[in-house]
Swiss-Prot record:
Source organism: Escherichia coli O127:H6 (strain E2348/69 / EPEC)
InterPro entries, sorted: Rhodanese-like_dom, Rhodanese-like_dom_sf, Rossmann-like_a/b/a_fold, ThiI_AANH, ThiI_fer, ThiI_N, THII_Thiazole_biosynth_dom, THUMP_dom
Gene name for this UniProt entry: thiI
Keywords of the record: ATP-binding, Cytoplasm, Disulfide bond, Nucleotide-binding, Redox-active center, RNA-binding, Thiamine biosynthesis, Transferase, tRNA-binding
Catalytic site: C456
UniProt entry tagged with the keyword RNA-binding: yes
Protein name: tRNA sulfurtransferase
Intracellular or extracellular location(s): Cytoplasm
Entry annotated with the keyword RNA-binding: yes
Residue ranges of every copy of the Rhodanese domain listed in the record: 404-482
Enzyme class: transferase
């Protein structure tokens, strides 16, 4: 099988040296992602495209799907590469490839040509289009908005029969820009802002301020791992978790109610800046949008920025909530965000929307900054690839089984889309579907006399959710790994 990778247009207008660097990085990223599917595949770069050739036909769909999620790719063409002799040979090969697709449909033919030939692209379009129209009685030519567009590419003595075109996510290849540290809470905003910086070519590390215990951190780990695995797995990144409960406690005890929100955000920026400096990261990323909450007015944002020299990027600053939620839905983080607890908004009953710098600084004089230094020093830094392994170590009390007993039921916790695409059927045992994001509210409604074997494709989510359910007092859960 063969795929032709077309570059994001902004890459093609770069200078020759920059364009070549971007293409080299994108080629390396593609190799890093696809080697998990087929170690024998070949990735070959050209000036205006990248070729991916693989032998394992069983991995075709997985490879195609992975390519559509790698930043820097505009679209992917799945092609059949065959030799040809003349225009009639091109027509005959196109007829075999497209006959079934064109039955009862309107169509047109579009050709791209490179090399020296005694015909033009338009000549091929007319010849092939006329031939298809004659040999497929139920099809008819329609040059504007046809049901099917027959795409052909001619290069020297090779014909590329395009079997399908699939849109990529665009943007710049990860690694072409410098690293950033995303302040991730697991909600709609931080997930989308992290994705936007990945799409713009940054390697995104994650910094999480834990205000809600182990269950909250587990949820945010899921979001960070999902974003990395789906869009950024070509690079290693860090997940840094900071226990911020002592800081919140100090704020609640000593800070005036109206100033709490701004001061909490200032403490987060201070802490994140220290983490960024430690790892040589150039900028912080937040999901703040102008006017969305009290701490996100221009006055308050300026005061928050003042505590650090580190650049703070806010890709969502002009977005409304509906737009952000739509983006979260597109990238697959909506379901995570809907069930994620939000702690930042509850610590102040009457927050100020226009904080005064002198008042903020006066309130901060009451704060014991050694607490902030201590929580940063004790921050837990994990390679995001080790989240699954670390979870397995944490869930020592959750049994992993590869078989089942008479009282067991398999609980498929994949998302609804994954379940519909690839239903789980296991002979000799009932399988119940309950997406992971509904476990916190719906697991208690299940028959608690049964033992529930949590299952997902890779086992990461099932381990994380097993830990969460154990913490909630459910002891009738195991992890199923056949």
């Amino acid at each position: 099988m063969k795929f032709i990778i077309k570059l994001f247009p902004e890459i093609t207008i770069k200078s020759q040296s920059v364009r070549l660097r971007f293409i080299k990085i994108l080629t390396g990223n593609i190799r890093n992602v696809l080697k998990h599917y087929d170690e024998t595949l070949a990735v070959v770069r050209h000036w205006d495209n990248i070729e991916v050739r693989a032998k394992d036909e069983n991995q075709r769909l997985a490879i195609r799907d992975a390519l559509t999620r790698i930043p820097g790719i505009h679209h992917i063409l799945e092609v059949e590469d065959v030799p040809f002799t003349d225009m009639h040979d091109i027509f005959e090969k196109a007829l075999v490839q497209y006959r079934d697709q064109l039955e009862g449909k309107t169509f047109c033919v579009r050709v791209k040509r490179r090399g020296k030939h005694d015909f033009s692209s338009i000549d091929v379009e007319r010849y092939v289009g006329g031939g298809l129209n004659q040999h497929i009685e139920s099809a008819r030519v329609k040059l504007t908005n046809p049901d099917v567009t027959v795409h052909l590419e001619v290069e020297d003595d090779r014909l590329l029969l395009i079997k399908g075109r699939y849109e990529g996510i665009g943007g710049f290849p990860i690694g072409t820009q410098e690293d950033v540290l995303s302040l991730i809470s697991g909600g709609f905003d931080s997930g989308v802002s992290s994705y936007m910086l990945m799409r713009r070519g940054c390697r995104v590390h994650y910094c999480f301020f834990n205000l809600g215990g182990a269950a909250h951190e587990i949820g945010v780990r899921q979001v960070a791992h999902y974003l990395w695995n789906r869009f950024g797995s070509s690079h290693r990144v860090r997940f840094v978790a900071i226990n911020f409960e002592p800081v919140v406690g100090e704020i609640l005890e000593k800070i005036d109610d109206g100033q709490m929100g701004v001061i909490l955000k200032r403490m987060m920026v201070r802490a994140a800046s220290k983490v960024a400096e430690r790892y040589g990261v150039q900028a912080l990323v937040t999901g703040e949008a102008l006017g969305q909450v009290s701490s996100q007015t221009l006055t308050n944002l300026r005061l928050i920025d003042n505590v650090s020299d580190t650049l703070i990027l806010r890709p969502l600053i002009s977005y409304d909530k509906e737009h952000i939620i739509n983006l979260a839905r597109q990238i697959g983080t909506e379901d995570f965000a809907r069930t994620m607890p939000e702690y930042c908004g509850v610590i102040s009953k009457s927050p100020t929307v226009k904080a005064v710098k002198s008042k903020i600084e006066a309130e901060e004089e009451k704060f014991d900054f050694s607490i902030l230094d201590k929580v940063v020093e004790e921050a837990n830094n994990v390679d995001i690839r080790e989240i699954a392994q670390q979870t397995e170590q944490e869930v020592v009390e959750v049994e992993t089984v590869n078989g089942f007993g008479p009282n067991d039921v398999i609980l498929d916790i994949r998302s609804i889309d994954e379940q519909e695409d690839k239903p789980l059927k296991v002979e000799g045992i009932d399988v119940v579907s309950l997406p992971f994001y509904k476990l916190s509210t719906k697991f208690g409604d299940l028959d608690q006399s049964k033992t529930w074997l949590l299952w997902c494709e890779r086992g990461v989510m099932s381990r994380l959710q097993a830990l969460y359910l154990r913490e909630q007092g459910f002891n009738n859960v195991k992890v199923y790994r056949p």
